[in-house]
Amino acid sequence: MGTLATRAACHGAHLALALLLLLSLSGPWLSAVVPGTPPLFNVSLDAAPEQRWLPMLRHYDPDFLRTAVAQVIGDRVPQWVLGMVGEIVSKVESFLPQPFTDEIRSICDSLNLSLADGILVNLAYEASAFCTSIVAQDSQGHIYHGRNLDYPFGKILRKLTANVQFIKNGQIAFTGTTFVGYVGLWTGQSPHKFTISGDERDKGWWWENMIAALSLGHSPISWLIRKTLSESESFEAAVYTLAKTPLIADVYYIVGGTSPKEGVVITRDRGGPADIWPLDPLNGEWFRVETNYDHWKPAPKVDDRRTPAIKALNATGQAHLNLETLFQVLSLFPVYNNYTIYTTVMSAAEPDKYLTMIRNPS
């Protein structure tokens, strides 16, 4: 864990890396507006769940947050779900893992929202997280992990993107990137242990499956990422938890460690792993690219982000891989596109270099 006394030094490292990234984004890699870094907040896990997110919420206009919730729910949640929302929440609330439900209830109370709306907006984000994730090993055995998170509602979500340091016993237990009001994580790092990102695996009939799975006590996708970051003590333990824990929907979990060969893509069914795809650098397979499609199947021509990413990594070369060049790969169209909300690059062995940059800012 990192002490809070190092926060200023870490912030300086973030700025230095950000400057290098901005200087490197020239030529064919990117034609976008210069990205920006999101705000950084602390969330104390030593505080009661009802108190954890309140300091962060005070930095945002409640009316804007309520508008964001209404827009996401109105667009992502089917009408048949909205029509029976009260009944649904009353049925699944007792099955939702803690402390997440109490945290959501507190956020709702602060914003004068119903618990039903709070739970729905947290679950709605789980339905459409289109992404590109890369885990790779350089020629010296260092592991790097990067991801783009693509999502609708860019004008709103870019304003709600934040980095969060989760504090336990006065130390940084883990770090993640999330949206204000969303208690899960799609991107995170446990310092000196492992990194995780999640990519949606769309199998259809999502809401029906979700409601059925919640009633069985299965975990939401992003909540398991946060739980794993909080509780797992090693790369191996994280992979086991992410592979075996029952989920409300299918997903791809991408995990990076701190030692050579510690990188893997876990293709998940709701009940368990469908496939485990580790790095194999001794046989020249020093990176893994995961978008939103099973890696053993061709990527659809209408959404092939995989092939450009692979070509860019091969052009970069293992000897030249680092966080800056990985960011460049994630800045190549269509890996980077109009729906990209943020890009994160990270390495668990160097946790102070965790960096998220907001893309396509207005």
Curated annotation (Swiss-Prot):
Q: How does it assemble?
A: Heterodimer of an alpha and a beta subunit, produced by autocatalytic cleavage.
Q: Which GO terms describe its cellular component?
A: cytoplasm; lysosome; membrane
- Family, as annotated: Belongs to the acid ceramidase family.
Protein name (Swiss-Prot/TrEMBL): N-acylethanolamine-hydrolyzing acid amidase
Q: Where on this protein are sugars attached?
A: N42, N112, N314, N338
Pathway as given in its UniProt record: Lipid metabolism; fatty acid metabolism
Show which residues form the site (Important for enzyme activity): R147, N292
Q: Give the species this sequence originates from.
A: Mus musculus (Mouse)
User: Which reaction(s) does the protein catalyse, per the Swiss-Prot or TrEMBL entry?
Assistant: N-hexadecanoylethanolamine + H2O = ethanolamine + hexadecanoate; an N-(long-chain fatty acyl)ethanolamine + H2O = a long-chain fatty acid + ethanolamine; N-dodecanoylethanolamine + H2O = dodecanoate + ethanolamine; N-tetradecanoylethanolamine + H2O = tetradecanoate + ethanolamine
Q: Name one Pfam family in it.
A: CBAH
The record's InterPro entries line, in alphabetical order, gives: Acid_ceramidase-like, Acid_ceramidase_N, CBAH/NAAA_C
